[in-house]
Curated annotation (Swiss-Prot):
A GO molecular-function descriptor: ribose-5-phosphate isomerase activity
Residues annotated as catalytic: 103 (proton acceptor)
Primary role: Catalyzes the reversible conversion of ribose-5-phosphate to ribulose 5-phosphate.
Name the record gives this protein: Ribose-5-phosphate isomerase A
Enzyme class, spelled out: isomerase
Annotated pathway: Carbohydrate degradation; pentose phosphate pathway; D-ribose 5-phosphate from D-ribulose 5-phosphate (non-oxidative stage): step 1/1
Record note on quaternary structure: Homodimer.
Stored HAMAP family: Rib_5P_isom_A (MF_00170)
Cystine pairs: none
Binding site for substrate: 28-31, 81-84, 94-97, 121
Length: 218
């Protein structure tokens, strides 16, 4: 089974958690694209979706799924999204696709976070994947200096503007042994919109695509 086939297995397995008549929180990325395709197969059974990115919104609309504004929804039953890394405590690094802030917002209004990944995303310690930080453009240099003080090696993601009009710093060489503490520290830097650590709001369910099919941990 290829890596993409494992992603597909995880994406389709997440349909188990979609309630009839519900509005579904939808993340961003290659694994989520498989979930969106799966959602299209039951589009008449759901009310619609709240999307975390322009890219996911376009894909949902192409499949005929109604997309609601986040401000028009009080609470979602589930949010389905991928991760760049996930540890045993279900804390994650996300934001490789630059949608981290909107992903955090949709996760915050969801009762259950279902994380869909392939087996390559599981790690013992977070930080091998560069940690994305969304930053107000005028604060980029200042935030980079502050991230160096925290032991990181930040790199400006050239040519990338987020859906919110901001920039991304990718922080390399971090051994993140206390994700919640680091999430708080980075979010406390002036000019940071949010950091791609999902530690305070980790995953409730992890669906991993494996060569044998989807493995579900609740």
């Amino acid at each position: 089974m290829t890596q993409d086939e494992m992603k597909k297995a995880a994406g389709w397995a997440a349909l188990k958690y979609v309630e009839k008549g519900s509005i579904v929180g939808v993340g961003t990325g290659s694994t989520v694209n498989h979930f969106i395709d799966a959602l299209g197969s039951i589009k008449d059974d759901i009310k619609g979706a709240v999307s975390s990115s322009v890219a996911s919104t376009e894909r949902l609309k192409e499949l005929g799924i109604e997309v609601y504004e986040c401000n028009d929804v009080a609470m979602l039953d589930i949010y389905v999204d991928g991760a760049d890394e996930i540890n045993a405590a279900r804390e994650m690094i996300k934001g490789g696709g630059a949608a981290l802030t909107r992903e955090k917002i949709v996760a915050a209004i969801s009762e259950k976070f279902v994380c869909i990944v392939d087996g390559t995303k599981a790690v013992d310690v977070l930080g091998q994947f560069p940690l994305p930080v969304e930053v107000i453009p005028m604060a980029r240099s200042y935030v980079a200096r502050e991230l160096v003080k925290l032991g990181g090696d930040p790199a400006y993601r050239e040519g990338v503007t987020t859906d919110n009009g901001n920039v991304i710093l990718d922080v390399h060489n971090m051994q993140i042994t206390n994700p919640k503490e680091l999430e708080d520290k980075i979010n406390g830097i002036a000019g940071v919109v949010t950091v791609g650590l999902f530690a305070h709001r980790g995953a409730d369910v992890v669906i991993t695509g494996t060569p044998e099919g989807a493995k579900i941990e609740e």
